[in-house]
Design a protein with these regions (language model features):
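Intrinsic disorder/low-complexity detector
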Residues: 1-9, 45, 61, 69-74, ...
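An amphipathic, aromatic/His-enriched active-site/gating alpha helix that lines ligand/cofactor pockets
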Residues: 17-38, 58-97
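Accessory recognition modules or surfaces
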Residues: 3-9, 19, 42, 47-64
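Hydrophobic alpha-helical segments
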Residues: 23-25, 48, 53, 72-73, ...
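Residues in flexible loops and secondary-structure boundaries
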Residues: 16-18, 45-48, 65, 78, ...
Length: 112
């Protein structure tokens, strides 16, 4: 299993619209392609708004296949286009990290 950490920098004025779109549309469509979202957070320090979420994947091939299907989804493309036209920019930047646990780290949930 691998974990993927996604960090989106979002315009402060669009925070609520972004979160609504993610909750109502992105997460639902991601579930269609077997995305396992473990948790989601926001960080609003330093005059920036960041949306952070952690995913679990079986392996890199599973992750790549899931993202390819999600990005090719016509419903998601239509939603992104429509909401961006109505509300403006939703994402200013994306940081994508693939996390490998250290040998001395406990697994998520505290299991060894």
């Amino acid at each position: 299993m691998i974990n993927q950490l996604r960090i989106y920098t979002i315009p402060p004025d669009n925070k609520d619209h972004f979160l609504d779109r993610f909750r109502d549309h992105a997460a639902r469509i991601m579930a269609r392609y077997d995305f396992r979202i473990l948790s989601m957070w926001t960080d609003e320090r330093n005059s920036q708004v960041k949306f952070v979420y952690l995913l679990a994947w079986d392996d890199a091939a599973d992750m790549d296949a899931g993202w390819s299907k999600f990005m090719a989804d016509t419903e998601w493309s239509d939603i992104k286009k429509r909401t961006s036209e109505e509300q403006g920019d939703f994402v200013l930047g994306i940081e994508d990290l693939i996390l490998t646990p250290c040998a001395f780290s406990s697994a998520l949930g505290g299991d060894q």
